[in-house]
Curated annotation (Swiss-Prot):
Keywords per UniProt: Cytoplasm, Elongation factor, Protein biosynthesis
Protein name: Elongation factor Ts
GO BP annotation list: translational elongation
Transmembrane segments: none
Origin species: Staphylococcus aureus (strain NCTC 8325 / PS 47)
Pfam families xref list: EF_TS (PF00889)
Major subcellular location class: cytoplasm
Family: Belongs to the EF-Ts family.
Length: 293
């Protein structure tokens, strides 16, 4: 049997919001497998599905830049929030975003080797900024999207660049509508554009969890199937952008809102600073010592 560490219990609590003893029991029952433990808690009705971005621990900025029919969303990390608010750092983020669009670099590694208009490489530019700002800075990721003249990009930054969203709306040039949908995605955090993007494997997994949940609630087997399909539809609505109630007008779905503009959401990218990353943990005493150096 796997040893269940306090750190593992803490991680499961943060992912599910379940109580400590429930988390410990779930991990014991599943030999310390955190994904199976999440399913166990859900089947028992103790926890909801864990969010995709469980821990936000790094600092930095997300920025969206558009040029004609090309757009990019980029995340650049810093060590502290103080630097993320620094004007020089903000200018660097915009400069890097424009460089991605100009060079169409495919990876972060390839981007670092590209040459800026001043003749220096992006790698050299970052090192210069580190020297000036006094913190480690790094380009974490970026995504380029393209459209036609008949489509629209939507760009939205929340909390000064803590969250950024880039949307692509087909069949409409209404940038305001595309931005409104980007704002919706920033707030609600869907995983997919539509249910067509959800894999059969994910649907079957969710169906099985919901079935066990219903059976554990003591529901008669003859109505479980109907219940599961109803809950599955609700689950898909929660993770698919076009089926969600539009935040600016909950009386219509995102799909219906865009239809009134003659458009259709075909793609989006949502970045939240540091999602999935963990910053080094320090205890309070070490933190104070570090500040006194």
């Amino acid at each position: 049997m796997a040893t269940i560490s306090a750190k593992l219990v803490k991680e499961l609590r943060e992912k599910t919001g379940a109580g400590m003893m429930d988390c410990k029991k779930a991990l014991t029952e599943t030999d310390g497998d955190i994904d199976k433990a999440i399913d166990y808690l859900r089947e028992k009705g103790i926890a909801k599905a864990a969010k995709k971005a469980d821990r936000i621990a790094a600092e930095g900025l997300v920025h969206v830049e558009t040029k004609g029919n090309d757009a990019v969303i980029v995340e650049i990390n810093s060590e502290t929030d103080f630097v993320a608010r620094n004007e020089g750092f903000q200018e660097l983020v915009k400069e890097i975003a424009n460089q991605v669009l100009d060079t169409k670099a495919e990876t972060v590694e390839a981007l670092m080797e590209t040459t800026l208009p001043n003749g220096k490489s992006v790698d050299e530019r970052i090192k210069e900024a580190i020297s000036t700002i006094g913190e480690k800075l790094s380009v974490r990721r970026f995504a380029i999207r393209t459209k036609t003249d008949n489509d629209a990009f939507g760009a939205y930054l929340h909390m000064g660049g803590r969250i950024g969203v880039l949307t692509v709306v087909e069949g409409s040039t209404d940038e305001e509508a595309a931005r409104d949908v980007a704002m919706h995605i920033a707030a609600i955090n869907p995983k997919y554009v539509s249910s067509e993007q959800v894999s059969e494997e994910e649907i079957n997994h969710e169906r099985e969890v919901l079935k066990q949940q219903a059976l554990n609630e003591g529901k008669p087997e003859n109505i479980v199937e109907k219940m599961v399909e109803g809950r599955l539809r609700k689950y898909l609505q929660e993770i698919c952008a076009v089926d969600q109630d539009f935040v600016k007008n909950p009386d219509v779905t995102v799909e219906a809102f865009l239809k009134t503009k003659g458009g259709k959401l075909v793609d989006f990218v949502r970045y939240e600073v540091g999602e999935g990353m963990e910053k080094r943990e320090e205890n309070f005493a070490d933190e104070v010592k570090g500040q006194m150096k």
